[in-house]
Amino acid sequence: MINISFPDGSIKQFAKNITAYEVANAISMSLAKAAMVAEINGELQDLSIVIDNDCKFRILTAKDPECLEIIRHDAAHLTAEAVKELFPETQVTIGPAIENGYYYDFARDKPFTNDDLAVIEAKMQELSQKNEQVTRELWDRDKAVEFFKSIGEHYKAEIIASIPAGEPITLYRQGNFIDLCRGPHSPSTGVVKHFKLMKVAGAYWRGDSRNEMLQRIYGTAWATKEQLDSYLLMLEEAEKRDHRKLGRELDLFHFQEEAQGMVFWHDKGWSIYNTIEQYIRKKIRKNGYTEVKTPVLVDKSLWEASGHWEKFRDDMFALETDDKTLALKPMNCPCHVQIFKQGIKSYRDLPLRMSEFGLCHRNEASGALHGLMRVRSLVQDDAHIFCAAEQITDETVSFCKLLTEVYKDFGFTDIKVKFSDRPEIRAGSNEVWDKAENALKEAVEQAGFTYTLNPGEGAFYGPKLEFVLTDAIGRQWQCGTLQMDFVLPERLDASYVAASGEKKRPVMLHRAILGSLERFIGILIEEYAGRFPLWLAPVQVAIATITSDLNDYALEVQKALIDNGVRTDFNISPDKINYKIREFSNQKIPMIAVIGKQEQENKQVAIRRLGTTDQEVLSVEQLIAVVKEENEKYL
């Protein structure tokens, strides 16, 4: 007999070699019917798994969040099965679950069309309704390679041949379809009911541009129809808010082939950029940071010493000149250490908070570039805090408070924290890691946050905090980070003189709030749907005259606004006033100052705020005061 422990603390005895499904059925027939997978000693397993030892046991159903990834993996197999039935000449490759869905890559001469997707989706519904049994099979490696070659699935044969010897080869069969997979999977295809195929894109085999191009079908799958409908509605809203679309419509920026991944900022977009930089600069000065500027192009010897050359060489832009190899910096930290090392530092100088709007370059694959969200040239709101070990908690608390203030000012109040602790391969002793992790945990709790743990996901040189924002339509964006570093000060020989007179290494805290300004602006465009708050809007007040004889007064108003730092635009053309208002509203300008004869006579303007038809009559001085008051809250 074996002892099986359940989540409620109870322990029951069962005969050896019982399956997970049989255990579920012994608990409740309804539970067995709803069961998708079992968690055995913390690992998800198929219901068909045989249990022959004592274990901790839990049954998972579609209601459990862990099962969403299972459903999506099931849906990927269902997609492949449907494609093979409809287009038997197509070869299947890989199909993992990803955030919000899954994809499956296919090798096929003829590209899939949108009409094909509709047919494939209908076939998937048919296969789901058949409720085909899904079974796990353990195969001999050579037999599996020969089998897939014999049915023309050469990509699968290649994958199996690359699996290290001794690892089990598991295949999953459903109906006439069989696929290589580690699993686990649901017991039948009927579990996958709520799905939709989204699009087709190109993808290189094994992600290598030297390999053949495959066709990637993206899909989404959910546990309930309500979840699917909600997600599709969110996507519809996200499409309206797409920063690339709004960037064109609002004349903020553009990209072009001659400079892939590099932003061409137009005057309005650059205004937003500079306003954010001005805002952050004010915040960090108030919080005791110095601001520096370091070179963009640095000899590779520094990157070799820091370890970046070995780790990130393929992602760096390098050039040869005067028998030297120079690289555009992908990050700022080694350069900040060079500033720290200028002159002797004492414990009295710590903590030293060094910030930079650092221009960095990363050689992202062209296929990974995505508007402002993924670029090759980026500016980080980067800072490094050089401190003693006993200052880590206080510095982290201060950073968390600063970060919270910044996010709140931009309208983000739902902030989640992820804590990544020690990986298996790491620098430093367990004692050092214990102190570091405890310092971060204590700081997060003092700052009023709760956190979720990412076990083993810290960098080899220290634990990490990630700060995740939730936007207006429920999407999550990881922006802020605080990364502890024991290694770089050692590698680059940074030190300070302790109170005892001995030389010590500072701890280095890498931290950012926005991440990159480019990406954060992309997030803001989508968060606000282009309707920037008054203090951040590239044009704060637009002036529109009702008749042309009011133009001289309109120009007087514009000059007064500009002289007082108000960003303005105007339209004194002969066009009708309703047309002018509509055009300025389409540009999402927060305030429109309408000027008629009465406004001219009284030295006033009629203010219409974006999204309303109400008008408020103000003197020019009052209008200036309203805008200045808003600006001064942030700038």
From Swiss-Prot:
SMART domains: tRNA_SAD (SM00863). Its EC number is 6.1.1.3. Its cofactor is Zn(2+). Zn(2+) binds at residues 333, 384, 510. Gene3D superfamilies: 3.10.20.30, 3.30.54.20, Anticodon-binding domain, Bira Bifunctional Protein, Domain 2, Threonyl-trna Synthetase, Chain A, domain 2. Residues 1-61 form the TGS domain. It comes from the Bacteria. InterPro entries: aa-tRNA-synt_IIb (IPR002314), aa-tRNA-synth_II (IPR006195), aa-tRNA-synth_II/BPL/LPL (IPR045864), Anticodon-bd (IPR004154), Anticodon-bd_dom_sf (IPR036621), Beta-grasp_dom_sf (IPR012675), TGS (IPR004095), TGS-like (IPR012676). GO terms for molecular function: ATP binding; metal ion binding; threonine-tRNA ligase activity; tRNA binding. Residues 242-533 are annotated as: Catalytic. Catalyzes the attachment of threonine to tRNA(Thr) in a two-step reaction: L-threonine is first activated by ATP to form Thr-AMP and then transferred to the acceptor end of tRNA(Thr). Also edits incorrectly charged L-seryl-tRNA(Thr). This is Threonine--tRNA ligase.
